[in-house]
């Protein structure tokens, strides 16, 4: 079995840093430090991590988003419970009794409240609560909570970086630290080699809340072509095989009206030529990734999408196969 220790170490470090959309500094700082080993780095006005290597050929941008899904505190009620809203597409079905960290004036442990099954009404059995019914218990009364927590503070879901059997790992924020890890590993493989293009890298903020980091970062870089790396749907026992890709069988190459078909075909040809496993991912319109924003940046950018299949997307236990990175 191939040793994936290098990419595993990169991914574990990235997943250990926090960075909910709009408050990405922890994760962005970690990514910037790692990117600085390969190129000059700066942070954009929105906080995206940007870098560039000079070259004489076409200007190509590699993008992956650095933000992760989470929650944002909206209010503190009279009993000291924190009311929250989604920051990105958190899966409400798995939130009951979840352990979280509230990033206030200091990091505070919390648990999302859960109604005991004994007290739930028959009509509510098996149903997820509406978001306005969710609260976080931090073990404090309102006065004490107000000293440490303010509306707007971000909340992350707790979870460990788990090494599974074989080459699979599970962790919060694999979406999209796996894409960031792929680019960093690519740069390591390119170190010391001549390349015939000008290469820019963008670890963009705020993808989970609309893609503003990618749109502004691509405008600043002004590339001729771009490749975004993100995650997509991996195999699951309760989902039709037509709707996902298999874990461990390679990166997904995107085909969509919003993507440049010549680039997608070229990427597939290179993968075949080099013996790199890949899988097609066909979409009928927009991709739901940063490609949608990069494509319309400036006067337009030819864009391709490479996605890593994962399971349990938008939960604290996202799972991927390192072979696909």
Predicted segments, located by residue:
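N-terminal hydrophobic/helix-forming segments and targeting peptides
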Residues: 1-325
């Amino acid at each position: 079995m191939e040793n994936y220790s290098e990419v595993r170490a990169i991914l574990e470090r990235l997943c250990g840093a926090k960075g909910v959309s709009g408050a990405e500094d922890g994760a962005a700082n970690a990514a910037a430090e790692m990117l600085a080993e390969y190129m000059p780095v700066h942070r954009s006005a929105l906080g995206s991590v940007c870098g560039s290597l000079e070259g004489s050929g076409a200007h190509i941008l590699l993008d992956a988003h650095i933000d992760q899904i989470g929650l944002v505190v909206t209010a503190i009620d009279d009993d000291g419970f924190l009311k929250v809203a989604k920051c990105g597409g958190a899966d409400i079905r798995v939130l009951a009794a979840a352990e979280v960290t509230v990033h206030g004036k200091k990091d505070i442990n919390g648990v999302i409240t859960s109604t005991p099954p004994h007290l739930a009404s028959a009509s509510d059995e098996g149903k997820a609560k509406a978001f306005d019914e969710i609260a976080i218990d931090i073990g404090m009364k309102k006065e004490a909570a107000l000293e440490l927590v303010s509306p707007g503070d971000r909340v992350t879901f707790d979870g460990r970086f788990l090494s599974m059997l074989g080459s699979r790992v599970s962790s919060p924020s694999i979406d999209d630290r796996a894409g960031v890890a792929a680019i960093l590993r690519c740069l390591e493989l390119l170190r010391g080699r001549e390349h015939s293009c000008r290469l820019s890298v963008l670890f963009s903020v705020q993808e989970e809340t609309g893609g503003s980091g990618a749109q502004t970062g691509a405008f600043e870089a002004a590339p001729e072509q771009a490749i975004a790396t993100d995650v997509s749907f991996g195999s699951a026992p309760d989902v039709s095989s037509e709707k996902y890709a298999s874990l461990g069988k390679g990166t997904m190459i995107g085909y969509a009206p919003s993507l440049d078909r010549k680039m997608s075909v070229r990427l597939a040809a290179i993968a075949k030529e080099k013996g790199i496993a890949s899988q097609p991912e066909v979409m009928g319109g927009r991709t739901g990734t940063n490609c949608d924003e990069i494509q319309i940046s400036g006067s337009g950018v030819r864009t391709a999408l490479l996605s890593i299949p994962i399971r349990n997307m938008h939960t604290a236990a996202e799972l991927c196969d390192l072979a696909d990175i």
